[in-house]
Amino acid sequence: MGNNGSVERRTVLKAAGASLATLGLAATTGCGGDSGSSGDGTVTIRYAWWGADERAKRINQSIALFEKKYPKIKVKTDFQDYVAFWEKFQTQAAGGNPPDVFQNAVGFLRKYDKRGVLLDLKTQIDAGNLSLDNFRAGVEKVGQVDGKQLGIPVGSNTMSLVIDEKVFEKAGINPKQGWTWDEYFAALKKIHDTQKLPGDTGYFGIMYLYDLYLRQNGKAFFTKDGLGFDEADLTEWWTDAYNRVKAGIITDPKRVEQDKPKSSLSAAHGASEFTWDNFTVRYSAEGTSTYGLAPIPTTDGKQTGQYLASLMLSASARTKHPKEVAQFINFMVHDPEVGKIMGYDRGILATTEQFDAYKPTDAPNQAIAKYETDVAAAGVLGTITPHPAGADTCEAAFLRIAGDMSQGTTKVADAVKQFFSEAKTALAS
């Protein structure tokens, strides 16, 4: 998908109205160029992604390996930050000149498939140029829409709860798999009452967390062509959240804004925060406490509603080199050396070849790998919620309107009506 407990993602979504899953944070650009063929049979393909300098460095090292194995395929690169990437891509797609292969997220699959931008990679899979073997926990299905394979995952992530372990230990709280929302909210109140610290930094605007809550209760944020919940559902969610903000159990939204670009969790202005598991390396870098990953609360003591989301590689329906693009994607998701180079930069490595090849040595990444392995072993992973065209705009609206509601600038009832109005427009476009 692709923001959410992550300060960077909140900022990006407000600026761009864009989605998910994972993102790079520094605004940098590489060189672009036209794809084509030369007289000696060498083919050039264009590859674009969003990310920071560190991601660019890793990807360029991976491309060097690919070009060594496939000397007749050259790769021209282009990268920006998340906002600039999607602005440029939208212009390129509208002009009929998108890159041959590009980084993508689930929130954009139906949107650009609807516009005829994405190549169905099944033909290249059937031709033997691209393999769907050895993907972890069925994550390859994230890239499937209406029987078409529109994206190939490069990494996976799932929602998690990051906690300040020292605060939770002092409060005598030990979250375990299957704990309930009632237990979670009781824990937040206990932390507030005993340590004068908000228990959570603001869960109520995270679309992907609310989706898990809805899934636990037989619904979902989206259906294939619309919203999967009603105004009464959201009114209850936001009313409860507003009351907790007023009671001091949730961090004051104004404080959250002041803490940026830091997280209010790592700034010691909250004791927990929901975010994607692969984002959690930031807390140890930013904060002075120790941070851990706790299970998602449940409604029934069993099901968390979780699924694996993913960054993926997609191809242009207009590419003149579908075979070479498929070979490139295949190399980038299956080659063990690429896995060692990329690490968890784009999520937990999606294929077993790469997952087994990369062994993190730092504690935060070891914890992320263990968390995702434990979630899979717990048997709680389901199929990802459908993301209709316009899902990215809905996510941005949900975050923005929830922020206004939590600060009291918009009443809950008005905020709910505003969200449903904006979502209806976005999903109809």
Model-derived features: positions:
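Conserved N-terminal structural module of periplasmic/extracytoplasmic solute-binding proteins
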Residues: 2-111, 126-132, 300-301, 321-324, ...
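Short helix-initiation/N-cap motifs at beta->coil->alpha
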Residues: 79-88, 107, 179-183, 253-263
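Short helices/loops that flank or line small-molecule/ion binding pockets
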Residues: 86-97, 115, 167-168, 186-193, ...
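A structural signal for short loop-to-beta-strand junctions that line the ligand-binding cleft
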Residues: 92, 99-100, 129-167, 302-305, ...
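Hinge/lid segment of periplasmic solute-binding proteins
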Residues: 106-158, 292-294, 363-366
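Glycine-centered hinge/linker elements that transmit conformational signals in sensory
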Residues: 188, 226-254
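C-terminal lobe and pocket-closing loops
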Residues: 279-288, 300-397
